[in-house]
A protein has these predicted regions:
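Sec-dependent N-terminal signal peptides
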Residues: 5-14
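N-terminal secretory signal peptides that target proteins for export/translocation
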Residues: 1-2
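Sec/Tat signal peptide C-region and signal peptidase I cleavage site
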Residues: 15-19
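Long, low-hydrophobicity ectodomains and other hydrophilic envelope-associated domains
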Residues: 21-223
């Protein structure tokens, strides 16, 4: 997406313009968010926020619902949003999810951290336990729905919601699996999550093709 167009989107959303710094060919940084255009990945730091309990969110900002999230980050939601736009992510930008899977761009999410001898890497879904299936969340993509605007504000930024396990159009990324409307079904898979306050890296990968892209109309009113 054109950088000038992104700047216009930020202005219309009431968000500050962002300076992107090229750290190597095809690799850019926006704050603490690193964008690799060739690999089509976004990376940024976070910490383990909880190791047990209900998992309504996989990741929130420090001003988000930290009492319900596996991870938290100091990175701002709008920085992640701009990084996704730079990789061609569109999202659905709707404030309403129907019974079908959320519309948007499929992405994969990996969490990594330094272990005793080597770097540990797990799929984000490994960190969440599906009570109905009595096993970790099924493997597969998440959906970048892109949140939405309300009265000139970018809602993900206001709510601090980045990756949601339960259905939440305010978040940037949502879980498309069955039972996403059941707040009590998802818990933290403590076997796959390191100790609280462990530093981790969140890596979001955007496929070159998006077969599930689009399908929902854009709106700017909450329901």
């Amino acid at each position: 997406m054109n950088v000038r167009l992104i700047a216009t989107i930020l202005l219309l959303s009431g968000l500050p313009a962002l300076a992107q710094k090229e750290v190597s060919p095809g690799v850019f940084e926006i704050g603490k968010v690193r964008i690799n255009k060739q690999k089509r990945t976004i990376e940024f730091p976070a910490v383990v926020n909880m190791k047990e309990g209900l998992a309504e969110y996989l990741l929130v900002s420090t001003k988000g619902k930290v009492h319900e999230s596996v991870l938290r980050t100091e990175v701002e939601p709008f920085q992640v949003h701009v990084a996704m736009l730079l990789l061609g992510g569109k999202g659905a930008q709707t404030n309403f999810f129907g019974p079908d899977k959320p519309s948007g761009d499929p992405v994969t999410i990996e969490i990594s951290w330094k272990g005793f001898l080597s770097t540990k890497r797990v799929a984000a879904e490994d960190m969440v336990f599906d009570r109905a299936r009595n096993r970790p969340m099924s493997k597969g993509s998440w959906i970048y729905n892109g949140s939405f605007q309300f009265e000139g504000l970018f809602v993900a930024q206001e709510a601090g919601s980045i990756i949601s396990v339960i259905a939440d159009p305010e978040a940037l990324i949502n879980n498309p699996r069955e039972r996403r409307d059941d707040d009590d079904n998802w818990t933290i898979n403590s076997k796959a999550v390191p100790s609280v306050e462990t530093l981790v890296t969140v890596t979001i990968k955007v496929p070159r093709t998006s077969p599930g892209e689009g399908g929902a109309s854009s709106t700017n009113s909450r329901q």
